Regions:
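Acidic, Ser/Thr-rich low-complexity intrinsically disordered segments
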Residues: 1-4, 8, 303-331
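Soluble extramembrane regions of membrane proteins in the secretory/endomembrane system
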Residues: 25-320
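Hydrophobic membrane-insertion alpha-helices, especially the h-region
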Residues: 4-20
Length: 331
């Protein structure tokens, strides 16, 4: 009998772990049907964007910039190219060309930013995952959002930064010099450090995370992949994103959505269209649609909190979180 219960315990633990990881990523694009997000449209964009390396200063970098700008104009957005010379430390600098598109909201409250970078890493990488996946997630996500004839309450700014790969220079140019920064309430940043696997939510905040976690769960992502241990480790790592610049230099809260599977593709010639996992792109699509629908209509003026939450993924229920000694389960 003792052996039976030991076996049963191991089986339950094994099944729990399996279901936890299996539930982290969608296996079909059917989950996107309610949003009208087309993976095929996104992949069509990506074929063009990742056709050649497009590092800052390269010929194809200009092609990608113009392509994104034209797509924003075709959707009827207000558009802008922010040209700015930026230097980092004593000897790193370049002229950056950030692409900005705006959807006007119905109120004068804080705005929402959809963020990614459009430059690829040096001459070898095709930049399909890092961060072409972010570019196409935003382009197709906004098209799907607008197709519902939804008028957001908050202004929505699409910011495609330049020169991320050589020191987050485009993000610095935007945060230090653009007037839009003063009214930003939240940033959603789409990134990659590999070519597949689940996309994890990693926050950036200078304060406590209670309200941010609550609103993340209220957005009802279909496949939330997040836990506070991963967040704690992330904060100790030296790898910053564009979102880090917003937090450190402007005290703006935000969420990173990033995948790290097949990490050996990162910053190499293997970061190609063919290597990007389709299900990973579907996961990013689920995030942007759920987050966009939610955060475009809530008050973003105060996302600060008096509490820190401990949170983790949980089978079936999706996420479990705890505030001090009080436990809550949200599905």
């Amino acid at each position: 009998m003792k052996n039976f219960f030991t076996f049963l315990s191991i089986l339950i633990i094994s099944l729990t772990v399996y279901v936890s990881f299996n539930d982290l990523i969608p296996s079909s694009e059917k989950s996107l049907d309610k949003y009208d997000f087309s993976i095929e449209n996104a992949l069509d964009h990506l074929r063009i964007i990742s056709k050649k390396p497009h590092y800052t200063g390269s010929e194809y970098h200009s092609v990608v910039r113009d392509y994104i700008l034209n797509e924003l104009k075709n959707m009827g957005l207000e558009t802008e190219i922010q040209n700015q010379v930026v230097t980092r430390f004593c000897c790193v600098g370049t002229n950056t060309s950030n692409i900005i598109g705006t959807i006007k909201g119905s109120s004068n409250g804080k705005s929402l930013v959809l963020l990614t970078h459009y430059d690829s890493r040096h001459h070898a990488s095709f930049g399909a995952s890092d961060a072409g996946s972010g570019v196409v997630t935003i382009l197709e996500g906004v098209r799907a959002f607008l197709s519902k004839n939804t008028i957001p309450i908050n202004d929505i700014h699409l910011v495609f930064t330049d020169a991320e790969e050589i020191g987050l220079l485009g993000a610095q140019a935007f945060v230090k010099n653009h007037s839009l920064v003063d009214n930003i309430g939240l940033v959603l940043n789409f990134e990659a450090r590999g070519s597949g696997g689940p996309s994890y939510m990693l926050m950036e905040t200078n304060g406590k995370n209670g309200v941010l976690i609550s609103e993340f769960i209220n957005a009802e992502p279909g496949f939330p992949a997040a836990n506070s241990l991963m967040y704690s480790i992330y904060k100790m790592l030296p790898n910053d994103t564009d979102l880090t610049v917003f937090r450190e230099q402007a005290n703006i809260n935000g969420f990173n959505f990033a995948f790290i599977g097949d990490h050996f593709d990162y910053h190499t010639s293997l970061d190609s269209f063919e290597r990007l996992d389709r299900n990973t792109l579907i996961h990013q699509a689920d995030y942007i649609m759920s987050m966009l629908n939610h955060f475009s209509k809530i008050n973003l003026s105060n996302l600060d909190s008096e509490n820190d939450y401990v949170y983790l993924n949980f089978p079936i229920l999706k996420m479990l979180f705890t505030i001090h000694t009080h436990g809550y389960i949200r599905s």
